[in-house]
A protein has these predicted regions:
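Beta-lactam-recognizing serine transpeptidase/beta-lactamase-like catalytic domain environment
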Residues: 1-16, 21-270
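Short, intrinsically disordered, charge-balanced linker/junction segments flanking boundaries
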Residues: 272-275
């Protein structure tokens, strides 16, 4: 589809790129702090019905704190955090980061993606909201979707520590600075730690985007993600379904830099590019 505007109209699950925003929600609501650790066995069991939500790394990440959960992209950590979250507060928080709304003043017919809520699910699917829906939202999967432009906006929002002008392709002399309430409640030290953790995604030997370290000569903050198109239980199952190119996961990343004073923020989606 060469004439389809994927940047403004393509919908993709944000996947693990959402984790810095979820982390800041947990900090803001005092559900966790930076030293809060869990034992990650590679899965999370939903207490209500014993349903198992699996992480991407078999065997898990062991004992892991918030910073390393971002660097290593621990699904179990964020499953656990999302489970403790109030869905209405969480969706309001994510809306401030650009999800589920039009953030581009001069894009042609932009898609706003989907930021799911209990009200949306009842109105569109005629089902109530389950705690498992919130758990999925914690890792950017499930019903949620976003456009690459929204992801770039989100990346810039993180880079600017919650201060951002309305996205526009035309340079304006007088730009209105926007600082949503949720961002104003986040401390400077927490923004610094988010940046440090996202730098670790590339710089730390355990970072999920460590392969990019050899390709650059400056420091960049990033968060990678894998958009699952077909749900599978094991790597062996995935090897079978990936024989069809259209079943392969999308690769996704947000980034900003050069650090510590970023000038550029980007998002990249590689369809069926895998992790």
């Amino acid at each position: 589809k060469p004439f389809f505007d994927r940047a403004a109209q393509g919908r993709y699950s944000p996947a693990s790129t959402i984790k810095p925003a979820i982390a800041l929600y947990g900090i803001k609501e005092e559900l966790i702090d930076w030293e809060f650790s869990i034992d990650d066995p590679g899965y999370f069991i939903l207490p209500e019905d014993q349903r198992v939500y699996r992480g991407w790394k078999e065997g898990g990440h062991g004992t892991i704190n918030l910073s390393q959960a971002i660097i290593q992209s621990s699904n179990t950590y964020f499953f656990s955090l999302a489970y403790k979250s109030d869905i209405n507060k969480l969706t309001n928080h994510l809306s401030d980061y650009g999800f589920g709304r039009n953030i581009c003043s001069d894009c042609f017919n932009p898609d706003i993606g989907l930021l799911p809520s209990p009200e949306w699910k009842m109105n569109n699917l005629n089902f109530g909201w389950f705690k498992g829906d919130t758990v999925n939202l914690g890792v950017g999967q499930g019903y949620m979707s976003a456009t690459p432009i929204q992801l770039a906006y989100y990346s810039a929002f993180l880079a600017n520590r919650g201060i951002l002008n309305k996205l526009s392709f035309i340079k304006h002399e007088n730009k209105k600075v926007d600082r949503p309430n949720s961002a104003s409640k986040i401390q400077k030290t927490d923004w610094e730690k988010i940046h440090k953790s996202m730098i670790g995604v590339i710089e730390d030997p355990r970072g999920t985007a460590r392969r990019l370290k050899s390709l650059k000569s400056y420091v960049v903050a990033a968060k990678s993600g894998t958009v699952e198109l077909v749900s599978t239980e094991t790597k062996e199952d995935y090897k079978i379904i990936r024989e069809n190119m259209g079943n392969r996961d999308h690769a996704i990343i947000i980034a900003f830099g050069p650090m510590p004073n970023p000038k550029y923020a980007v998002s990249v989606v590689i369809e069926n590019g895998e992790s």
